[in-house]
Design a protein with these regions (language model features):
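Core recognition of P-loop NTPase motor domains used across DNA-transaction enzymes
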Residues: 11, 41-49, 60, 72-73, ...
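Conserved, well-folded catalytic cores of nucleic-acid-processing
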Residues: 15, 19, 37, 52-55, ...
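Extended interfacial segments that mediate partner engagement and assembly in macromolecular machines
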Residues: 27, 75-142
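Long C-terminal interaction/binding lobes of large macromolecular proteins
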Residues: 102-103, 130-202
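Catalytic cores of large soluble enzymes that bind and process phosphate-bearing ligands
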Residues: 1-4, 37, 41, 117-121, ...
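Cys/His-rich Zn2+-binding cysteine-cluster or related metal-binding knuckle/ribbon modules and their
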Residues: 2-9, 18, 26-93
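Solvent-exposed alpha-helical segments within well-ordered globular domains of core cellular machineries
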Residues: 10-14, 28-32, 43, 47, ...
């Protein structure tokens, strides 16, 4: 069936099917829905995709997604620069910010250590984190990685690394209100608020 599509339609379907969670059938449905849209509406989507790829970058300090560098959180004078919460992905920052409780800053690892997938510590933003801590303003690191095998393993690795390089820094972990194997980005904001306020020393 797909072999009868024009080349431009087939290209669109192929590109849509590359997106996570979108199979060939879903890509076909989306492609034909776009074809039904007015040119103005379809081009508005194209403009939004172009804008996000040209304007969004990683903050040079915390590696969160931002349109300015450093990001708004990093330059906010009301934020406690001595309190750094380590998370896996930018989506986790949004989840923790939704609580309205956390007043520190963040460091986004952009992943977790996954030896089986050949994701090593050097592939994450761990060395920039160590450089940040070496600056002398950080007094507490909160491990906000997900309560998964990989998230816990990454947190343990970081704890040991911090103990070796910066033993003066207190290392804590979000309280275990989150179910094992869950993701911070999907957690209820009340659960996240409790996890922040009830954090425990590692």
């Amino acid at each position: 069936m797909s072999g009868s599509y024009t080349q431009s339609v087939q290209n669109l379907i192929d590109e849509l099917a590359r997106l996570p969670g979108i199979g060939l059938r879903s890509a076909e449905r989306i492609a034909f829905d776009l074809l039904k849209q007015t040119p103005e509406r379809a081009l508005k989507l194209a403009d939004a995709i172009r804008d996000v790829k040209t304007r969004i970058r990683h903050c040079s300090v915390c590696f969160n997604l931002t349109e300015q560098d450093p990001c708004e959180i990093c330059v906010d004078p009301a934020r406690d620069q001595g309190l750094v919460c380590i998370v896996e992905q930018p989506k986790d920052v949004l989840a923790l910010e939704s609580t309205g409780l956390y007043k520190g800053v963040y460091h986004v690892l952009l992943g977790v250590i996954r030896p089986l997938d050949d994701v090593q510590p050097a592939d994450l933003t761990i060395e920039p984190l160590m450089a940040r801590v070496a600056g002398g303003t950080v007094r507490e690191i909160i491990m906000g990685t997900n309560p998964t095998m990989e998230g816990d393993g990454t947190a343990l690795y970081l704890q040991q690394l911090l103990a070796q390089r910066h033993p003066q820094v207190q290392v804590t972990r979000l309280a275990r209100g989150l179910p094992a194997g869950s993701s911070i980005e999907y957690a209820n904001r009340n659960i996240l608020a409790d996890a922040i306020s009830g954090r425990q020393r590692m």
